[in-house]
Amino acid sequence: MNFNLLNKVIAGIVFIISFIVLFMTVQPSVSFWDCGEFIAASVSLQVPHPPGTPFFLLIGNIFSKLPIGENLGFRVNMISVISSALSILLLYLIAVKLIENYKGKKADNMFDAIATYVSAAIGALAFSFSDTFWFNGVEAEVYAFSTFLFAAVTYLIIRWNERADNKDSEKYILMIAYLVGLATGVHLMSVLAAVPVVMIIMFRKYVNDEESLKKTGYIFLGHIVIILLLAVFWWSSQKSQTAPTLEEYKDFDTKFKLFIAGISALIMGVYWKKIFTRNSFYMPLIIGGIALFATYPGVVKYLPELMTAIAGDNIVTEIIILALLFAGLGYGVHYSRKESKPTLHLVFMSFIFILVGFMTFAMVIIRSNQNPPMDENDPDTFTELVKYLNREQYGDFPTFKRRFATEPHQQIVYTGYSSDLDFFYTYQMNHMMTRYLLWNFAGR
């Protein structure tokens, strides 16, 4: 029997089931939260709240013109329905790939095929009808579309892993880079995929000593445990019942980050001969972190800031700077190919594709200059665009000390916790995160 065909049939069934249920439960018009804002912004290509979702709005504008239903809200809501159903399709295919990789072979008999495909289908459909995913899949929010982009990136890197030795395998990496660039115009959640993508590439192409990988993996595990234990001890000592000032917030955050960096530097310094090698578990993490940093905040925040610092609000100069950047990257592509440096060539090409995807943010400044009815923060110059991208209107918020509230009616709450750690565990973890997680599997 052709098990590949059976796999495709079940994948299609999973997609159809998910799509039908989501379609039957989709919001018929405008729902709560930011949905009305996104629908209105999509229909007329307006400027919503920072940091903007230009790629989502472009897709929403297309959907608003489709002859499906009479309600514009319903049309834009269908983005989430379709992207969520596609996410479930990709999740099924990913699960099949992972099961086959774990077994070390594809299904070669009916029992194996049923066990693999049915297990993957159950997992995918369970996710489809979980509280969070289902809720996001029936309204015009960015999370469903962002989940689809994340799923697409995950599926593409698995496909690349299977074909990494082929001459044209880099096309999967370039497609991933483009999707990551586009994802900046939807939600930054998908940008996080840059780290595991780079790690998989490193493990597949550069790591050739599994024993060294395991040893450094144990070092990394011990590294994390030491930091967590010391952090818990320090955090539990923060028992003040008086709200700190803004300067004290920032001072604690700075000390905490320096503490983590110092402990990390000490551990990595002791084991530097094992850590800074191609077969180290640390290297894929470090390079993956660099790739993430290059995308966000690198491309998303620092590139517009740099362009504004050089050219101010002169749009012609800004375009020239951007053209020079692409020219420099183009030369890097030419040089790396001429000198037969495939890794460097792939890095330059990937960065170009990320930049091209990020260019959807040009819509923000273009539409703001048209003065649409919804023009939040009025980002019609590069100076204002930088503020828009940096979300400056929201101000700063502490990274760690979040027990205290500024609202008078909430200030009495933080006295009910013995320490910052007590607040973190009792409220943030147990009440908020665990309860929310169980909504997906135990119901509300």
Name every feature range the model reports, one short phrase each.
Residues M1-V21, L86, M110-A121, I275-Y282, ...:
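Start-transfer (signal-anchor) and selected internal transmembrane alpha helices
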Residues N4-F32, F127-F129, L229-V232, F293-P297, ...:
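Transmembrane signal-anchor helices characteristic of membrane glycosylation enzymes that use polyprenol
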Residues V9, L91-F129, A164-K167, K171:
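Transmembrane-helix signature of polytopic, membrane-embedded enzymes
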Residues G12, M78-D108, A152-L156:
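Transmembrane-helix motifs of polytopic, lipid-linked glycan transferases
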Residues V43, L90-I94, F133, F145-D165, ...:
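Specific aromatic-rich, kink-prone transmembrane helix
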Residues A107-I114, V153-Y172, I201-S212, G269-N279:
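Membrane-interface transmembrane helices that cradle and orient dolichyl/undecaprenyl
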Residues V118-A121, L156, R163-G181, E211-I226, ...:
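Short hydrophobic alpha-helices at membrane interfaces in multi-pass membrane enzymes
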